[in-house]
């Protein structure tokens, strides 16, 4: 007799959980209770859900699990950034990064193991593509981090959000980790809905950001299904250069991308799109590039976020000097373009932008470096 795979409750959004509970004859309020236990209280045992009927808990224990990916290691940066390495099987891993700041706590999560887009400046893309993550594996990163951070005495707390907490540790979630979220849309969508659900994490749409390299048809779908803040990996002001840096541009060139951004803004929670621009020495950082970028940015309401490149050997690229970045940023601001320069965080644990999973396949380097700076997971369990 074949065993039936149990349902992982982490991956069910409110509608799917209500449907499951309804199949057992349960009322919608039972699904909401269950959702609060799983996502707000971080329960991983049905026995702990003492306000649920005993027979309902028994049904859950038979048919369901609450299970995140196994965590191999946690690393802490000197600047307070924390990174978890999750095992996705077959020798592959994904990474999740928590970035604490005075006014926010941002969790950067992954949507794929590896990435198929293969941007030239991104270490993650150079590792190749393994598989899409399931919704339970995507939201499981938030579930895990919330439990661990709330249990840590040294984690700063911020004013609460819609979900009813007096305080919260994670105030923002960005899908800027491994993978292209919009190429795993069917699994990303329920995860986003859980992030926004008042019975789960209760985050504002303005505080959840999906970053895309420009999958135009799925940008349009997201604007209808679950419009959250949008960041676009731009990195070049013209098609010829972007074709080289972001190969997806050959399928969805800049004219199509900018038109999709304009359509998205009609539904977006913010009145601008964030354009991410990785600063590469001599490649996309000249005065001419700045002039072209100004012309492009004037076509859509946007903010430019300049990102210092994090070098890795296989790229053959170098980071723009700090002075060049400052001049480039000033050119944009003088033209009236809202511009920020991203502060690098966690680069001593390879948690900075473009570095995720850069060591995942290099087991020797991982072992050597973890021996000196990794915190054993058993010390940080909630």
Swiss-Prot record:
SUPFAM superfamilies: Radical SAM enzymes (SSF102114)
Superkingdom of the source species: Bacteria
Location within or outside the cell: Cytoplasm
Record CDD domains: Radical_SAM
Active site: 95, 353
Radical SAM core domain residues: 101-348
Cellular component GO terms, alphabetical: cytoplasm
Enzyme's top EC category: transferase
Bound cofactor: record note: Binds 1 [4Fe-4S] cluster. The cluster is coordinated with 3 cysteines and an exchangeable S-adenosyl-L-methionine.
Binding positions ([4Fe-4S] cluster): 115, 119, 122
Primary location class: cytoplasm
Enzyme Commission identifier(s): 2.1.1.192
Catalyzed chemical reaction(s): adenosine(2503) in 23S rRNA + 2 reduced [2Fe-2S]-[ferredoxin] + 2 S-adenosyl-L-methionine = 2-methyladenosine(2503) in 23S rRNA + 5'-deoxyadenosine + L-methionine + 2 oxidized [2Fe-2S]-[ferredoxin] + S-adenosyl-L-homocysteine; adenosine(37) in tRNA + 2 reduced [2Fe-2S]-[ferredoxin] + 2 S-adenosyl-L-methionine = 2-methyladenosine(37) in tRNA + 5'-deoxyadenosine + L-methionine + 2 oxidized [2Fe-2S]-[ferredoxin] + S-adenosyl-L-homocysteine
Pfam family, one: Radical_SAM
Cofactor(s) needed by this chain: [4Fe-4S] cluster
BP GO terms, sorted: rRNA base methylation; tRNA methylation
Entries under InterPro entries matching the protein: Aldolase_TIM, Methyltransferase_A, RlmN_N, RNA_MTrfase_RlmN, rRNA_lsu_MTrfase_RlmN/Cfr, rSAM
Gene Ontology MF, one: tRNA binding
Alphabetized UniProt keyword annotations: 4Fe-4S, Cytoplasm, Disulfide bond, Iron, Iron-sulfur, Metal-binding, Methyltransferase, rRNA processing, S-adenosyl-L-methionine, Transferase, tRNA processing
Residues annotated as binding S-adenosyl-L-methionine: 179-180, 211, 233-235, 310
Disulfide-bonded cysteines: 108-353
Family that this chain belongs to: Belongs to the radical SAM superfamily. RlmN family.
Miscellaneous remark of the record: Reaction proceeds by a ping-pong mechanism involving intermediate methylation of a conserved cysteine residue.
Entries under PANTHER family matching the protein: 23S RRNA METHYLTRANSFERASE (PTHR30544), RADICAL SAM CORE DOMAIN-CONTAINING PROTEIN (PTHR30544:SF5)
HAMAP family in the cross-refs: RNA_methyltr_RlmN (MF_01849)
Name of the protein described by the UniProt record: Dual-specificity RNA methyltransferase RlmN
Protein species of origin: Bordetella bronchiseptica (strain ATCC BAA-588 / NCTC 13252 / RB50) (Alcaligenes bronchisepticus)
Source lineage: Bacteria, Pseudomonadati, Pseudomonadota, Betaproteobacteria, Burkholderiales
